[in-house]
Amino acid sequence: GGGGDPERTAKRLSSPLGKILRLDVSKSCGKKRYCVPSVNQYRTSKSKTKRLVFASGVRNPWRISVDSATGNLWVADVGQDAYEEVNVVSTGARGVNFGWSCKEGNAGFNSSQCAGLAGYVAPVTTLCHTEAVSGCTPPFVGESIIGGDVYRGRTAPTLGDRCRGQPPK
């Protein structure tokens, strides 16, 4: 989609843009080479795309990882002009909306796209762009976030908390 989501695809559930889609490729259902998981919020929708929507309101998710210990889904989402964000979909959550393009990070972005922001979940952390945000200082500075796997090993335990460098709880 275009910069700033001018066609509002991130909140339109019939569009795959601005979404995290979930499908089960370990089996086939009918003529499809995949199945729609029974836990998908919109699995009974008439819209083929909407059935697959697991989360909405993302701008450009740039790596997704499942935490093997909790089942939570960690999402690094590249922002538009001012913020990068790390989002988490908790195990069992349904219909999660991360707010794009009403919000960028925790800040407002386009207030005309805030109506009907059901299921909004704020990022667990944000990184600001130094040239775009007044007072933006390390350690939470970045230009294009890239996620990675959730690490829970013993060799480097401080890698267990991917946001703050603290050992996992």
Language model: regions and residue ranges:
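Beta-propeller domain segments
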Residues: 1-169
